[in-house]
């Protein structure tokens, strides 16, 4: 074989190998999940960014629970929440609502925003609070002020729904405020690897670009720390598996 042909052949082989490796890596990324025997219950969290959702298709695609964004700050409401809440419940999913907590509005004001939008349903999942820096305002309160405003949100919210709230925390937020967090079940974000052992968790968000039937585009995936019976008890107000 002439040298130019050999070079071309090797170049093609390397390119094909790189393409195959990239394809395999993408497949692994899109389909990676925790041990299903250990964590059998899979869930999603969504907002208006996922658009119109076919909830029956979601329920048929091995999804057991869902958290829906309902509110943010003191006055923002997710425009798809009411439809998502009604349709996801009708599809037989365990459904909860979450609030994106902002540092720039009083906690009590944010609680009113959440409570005014979320129905009181005995079988709903506990209310959840999204605590993170991404997408938040520029303020970075000290631990005492953050805790005071979070408590101002939690007190009326938990009194209204009769269940301890679930706290969603990113690694960055957890590092900054770990010692100031109240003793509540944690929903920990840890993409493609298990959360560290610093604190137990009830819900683990393990993927942020997954695909689920009934949803156009990527979606977050989660697992619950217990089995179906434990999830049902948690819906009823019992202590979450993995709660601190």
Language-model regions, residue ranges each:
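N-terminal Lys/Arg-rich, disordered targeting/topogenic segments
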Residues: 1-5
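Hydrophobic membrane-insertion alpha-helices, especially the h-region
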Residues: 6-27
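Structural preference for beta-strand elements that scaffold enzyme active sites
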Residues: 41-43, 64-65, 94-96, 124-128, ...
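Aromatic-lined carbohydrate-recognition surfaces of secreted/lumenal glycan-active proteins
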Residues: 158-175
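Structural recognition of alpha->loop->beta junctions
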Residues: 115-129, 133, 178-201
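Boundary/entry segment of secreted carbohydrate-active catalytic domains
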Residues: 20-72
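Substrate-binding cleft of extracellular glycoside hydrolase catalytic domains
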Residues: 36-51, 70-152, 158-160
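Functionally critical loop-and-helix segments that line ligand-binding/catalytic clefts
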Residues: 35-51, 56, 181-244
């Amino acid at each position: 074989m002439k040298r130019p042909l050999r070079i071309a052949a090797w170049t093609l082989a390397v390119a094909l190998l790189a393409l195959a490796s990239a394809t395999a890596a993408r497949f692994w990324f899109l389909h990676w999940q925790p041990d299903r025997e250990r964590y059998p219950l899979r869930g999603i969290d969504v907002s208006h960014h996922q658009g119109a959702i076919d909830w029956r298709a979601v329920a048929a695609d091995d999804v057991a629970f869902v958290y829906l964004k309902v509110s943010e700050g003191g006055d923002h409401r997710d425009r798809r929440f009411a439809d998502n809440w009604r349709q996801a419940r009708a599809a037989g999913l365990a459904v909860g609502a979450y609030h994106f907590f902002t540092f720039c509005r009083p906690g009590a004001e944010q609680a009113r925003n959440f409570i005014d939008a979320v129905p009181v349903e005995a079988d709903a999942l506990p209310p959840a609070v999204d605590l993170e820096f991404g997408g938040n305002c520029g303020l970075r309160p000290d631990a005492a002020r953050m805790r005071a405003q979070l408590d101002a949100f939690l007190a009326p919210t938990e009194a209204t729904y009769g269940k301890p709230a679930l706290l969603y925390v990113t690694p960055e937020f957890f590092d900054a405020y770990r010692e100031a967090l109240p003793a509540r079940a944690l929903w920990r974000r840890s993409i493609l690897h298990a959360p560290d052992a610093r604190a137990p968790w009830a819900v683990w968000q393990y993927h942020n670009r997954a695909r689920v039937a009934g949803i156009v585009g990527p979606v977050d995936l989660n697992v619950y720390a217990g089995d179906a019976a434990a999830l049902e008890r948690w819906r009823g107000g019992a202590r979450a598996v993995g709660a601190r």
